[in-house]
Amino acid sequence: GKLFDLIRNDPALRANTLVLVCSDNGPERGAGSAGPFRGFKTHLYEGGVRSSLIAWGPGLLAKQNHVNRTSVFSAIDLVPTLLDLTGSPHPKNANYDGESLPGTLLGKSAASRKAPIYFRRPPDRDSFYGDKDLPDLAVRDGKWKFLCEYDGAEPELFDMETDRGETKNVATQHNELV
């Protein structure tokens, strides 16, 4: 409370402060809920890889209490986004997997990253939580999410615009994508 009050009440701080709260993965099984999403920590389903990013900045955000449920924005997008947002130079020879999306972070845009996001499950987690044969690899590209084993077996494809809970595998209907 005191820190947020200080920021709200100081015009210079209010105009130039952005507080971010985020997590690196979904909840541990039994320690929380992934809401409508399938899976838990160590799973490559959305319940394991999706987590909230809370941004607070009374002088920077387009709207207060705004929830963006549609943009694809990854933790790897934070560094280039924050560098651009603050007008800081990018380090020489720095290559980022992330994309700069300051408008999305500030709630002024619903833009999503353009490049795919790749995921790999650690090899020692094949039967974590007693679940067998969890997918080893995943890629999120636009509205599509593809999961499979290391050898490409057991493909799963989900349309994330219509099936956020990853309940309907449409891989057989979209061989051209698989």
Predicted segments with their positions:
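Short C-terminal domain-edge/linker segments immediately following a structured domain
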Residues: 49-54, 84-87, 150-152, 177-178
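Histidine-centered active-site microenvironments of extracellular/periplasmic hydrolases
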Residues: 5-64, 74
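Short, well-ordered amphipathic alpha-helical segments that serve as non-catalytic structural scaffolds
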Residues: 1-3
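Intrinsically disordered, low-complexity polar regions and short flexible loop motifs
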Residues: 163
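C-terminal cap/loop subdomain of S1 sulfatases and analogous C-terminal strand-loop tails that border
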Residues: 26-33, 39-44, 64-67, 71, ...
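C-terminal structured subdomain/cap of oxidoreductase catalytic cores
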Residues: 167, 171-178
